[in-house]
């Protein structure tokens, strides 16, 4: 299995969503290898398929004043927050590689971070298999997961709190869970972490867990791939 990894740095949510949709079409047509987008978003709130507006705790007017947009999206899950200091990942993967088993795919996503946190930082993280998706440390969520699958190709993905401003989660009831908190790598270690270093580690552990040979490609490389494939399809 080959895996393209593209770190896009800071990207507006709607731009990232549009990019996912373009890549999804190419992956469905088998004109693109499995691709993992890693990036950050400016502060934004998204509502998944099971989400409720009542889990956003501040008014639309206040959000507008703060410049925080809200998007209703097709991923699984409830309400979540994205913002600077958080690694957001969008795997555009063919589920045929995991036997078209969605639960297995989510399990593997969780495994990436459980292994990364233990091996690289000595943090004992775990999954809550009986109730909730995601990766947890001491009862608090450090990685949120919510995917969508169309034609057996994945979209959306995960949000890993690295140096995230956790106060922003007070704007919402994260994932609709009133009795659970959130944490970050910075909070657990007691200091900020070199962000780009963690980005590389995420890619490395994706390669390990999914048995993939990964390579980093630039934003320009990705745009060129899309351009060439689109031009070919129009001929």
Curated annotation (Swiss-Prot):
SUPFAM superfamilies listed in its UniProt record: Class II aaRS and biotin synthetases (SSF55681)
Residues under site feature: Lowers pKa of active site Cys: 141
Domain (BPL/LPL catalytic): residue spans on this chain: 30-214
Residues the record marks as active site: 175
Any single Gene Ontology cellular-component annotation: cytoplasm
GO biological process: protein modification process
EC number(s) on file: 2.3.1.181
Family: Belongs to the LipB family.
Protein name per its UniProtKB record: Octanoyltransferase
Taxonomic source organism: Caldicellulosiruptor saccharolyticus (strain ATCC 43494 / DSM 8903 / Tp8T 6331)
Gene that encodes it: lipB
